[in-house]
Amino acid sequence: MLKIGRKTPLTNSDSGDNLYQVNGVAYIEGNLKLIHLRILIVLISHLQAALRFKISRRRPGIKVPESMLPDPGVLSLRGATRTVRVKITEFGLTPRNCGRLRQYLEELIDMPVVFPGYRKEGMIFPELVHSFTGLITDYDFPVYSRTVDISLPETLVHRLLLTEEGFSTYSRSAAFSITNKYTVRIYWLICSWRSKGGFVISLSNFRKILALGRGYDRYENITCKILRPAAEDLEGRFPIWFLYKTYGSGEERNIVFKIRTAVSPEQMKKESQYVWDVCFHLLHSVGANTTILSDIFSKVDYEDLRPFLSKVMDLTTYIKEARLDARHLTDPGHDKHISNVNAYIRAALNAWFSDWRIRYQDISE
């Protein structure tokens, strides 16, 4: 396997091996080692045709053509299966150093994993399973073979193809270059939330997803052994990295991730201009002084352009609705809290900038 040193940057040229992955994989609960995660990455790489098909059709519950799915396998005690044939070189191994692969596959047979439940109004998937007694059901790996046949529960294949819950892309070579299992999990998370600029997660949920043992009971251990090393490993070497802050204490503590991405100056200028123009017209539509935008926009990072635009849209929509409601009420104080639109917008945006918990979505809910 190609080894990439800590100081070797992974630029955008490394993105040609991007893999699609449903967002639920980033939240998978299980005591998965680094090699287990790499095996999962390889298995997902064999589902790319099916994932691309579902993503391109954009219809809930669409059936994937049989030709795009792994071959049907034997009926096991756990039900129907699908078999994926994998070259051992895909794991970064050669026939001479793959002896322990059998051990890792054996571990995955009895490795319980749980995906997040999926619920969305008007969309029912009665056949969907979220909890599995093993990530795989069986494997066939003859001595000296250059390939291994891995059997997956058919219900697991369906779960890995649940694009209705959202999906993301990440670089396979980048994920394989990471040498810490927790950093891989964080890499998946920030890739799935990059369009939102960041996310908030409770400490208890973070522990649960990463299956942290008693050695991480103290938050200081999580900071020193997981968050800080992951941030340092990704920053400057990957085209996507993160900053983080914590709020609260004890089990009420929240970790807030701010996601950073490498973009060209041209792309930054183009998207900044678009967001500026839309925000300018939105503020003008509610009678706000557009100089507010000049004062605040200089503080907006590229990753926060979309969240900033969303915030301005929410503010102006709320102001319009409040004014409309006030016309039908006799209470003169009903609209008092936004009687000064400029002060209201400025205060709301300043609070949005100062508190990352307001800026980003809480994924623990």
Label each PLM-derived region with a short phrase.
Residues 1-295, 299-312, 316-365:
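Charged, alpha-helix-forming regions
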